[in-house]
């Protein structure tokens, strides 16, 4: 399963042609559409194959590829996308070449997600996770449909039996949710959640450095501060329509 939230910079100004030309015939013929998300998946499969792992190999159908391999292929995918953008002549490509690459991939055993922006100064679209041992409904919100209510993550030990990943917190318990840092990977494997920095030209190791949220917001993306503000607002007014919308999303996630 593959997911993408964001967009590849200069997609229709030379990057798409370079990406499409770079993937093997096997992955080229697989793509049925023209979106950057579909072609990014083809590029991921091509990167996985070039690492020596056949995406259709029977030996991987039961145990998967391993989270380390998935992460390597994901990082290679991002590296290649950045390379395609650099390869487009400046007089052809868009003035703004920044990409928002929040990807997610799973082989049925491990999950690897990214929160990434190809910029040294901008914040990526937000990404959060919540982990614990049980996902419980605390009560029914007044006026909501039967079965809908306020949920929270509970933890009885260090294991992560349940891990939820979302672009914004799905509950009003802010302390249930951990922000994935900009330009990082989130890996879920065997009840363990790992976060690794994506160290490239756009990485900033300073914990005090504050990135700008303007770029992601102009692309219609939720940023970390926006998501935090939404949770705080909803927790003060449990009667808002936004609350019902959020609770509905929680039901889908729990189901």
What residue spans do the PLM features occupy?
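Conserved short alpha-helical segments that host acidic/polar catalytic motifs at enzyme active sites
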Residues: 1-255
